[in-house]
């Protein structure tokens, strides 16, 4: 699960790079939404990883 958290976090950072810097002008809103979705998925995966270890 922690591996998924890291993967989702990296995807969120890439989406933020495209969405917040204006590189992909046509897809700004989609990239911003994807950023928040993948940050949420990263947090959920992180919490699930910590709770499974106990």
Curated annotation (Swiss-Prot):
Keywords of the record: Cell membrane, Membrane, Transmembrane, Transmembrane helix
Keyword Transmembrane helix in annotation: yes
Membrane topology, as annotated: Multi-pass membrane protein
Spans traversing the lipid bilayer: 5-25, 30-50
Cellular localization per UniProt: Cell membrane
GO CC field: plasma membrane
Listed Pfam families: DUF1328 (PF07043)
HAMAP family with a match to the protein in the record: UPF0391
Similarity field: Belongs to the UPF0391 family.
Full protein name: UPF0391 membrane protein Daro_2080
Source organism (scientific name): Dechloromonas aromatica (strain RCB)
């Amino acid at each position: 699960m922690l591996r998924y958290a890291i993967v989702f976090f990296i995807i969120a950072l890439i989406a933020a790079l495209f969405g917040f810097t204006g590189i992909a002008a046509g897809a700004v809103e989609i990239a911003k939404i994807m950023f928040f979705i993948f940050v949420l998925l990263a947090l959920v995966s992180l919490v699930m990883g910590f709770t499974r270890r106990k």
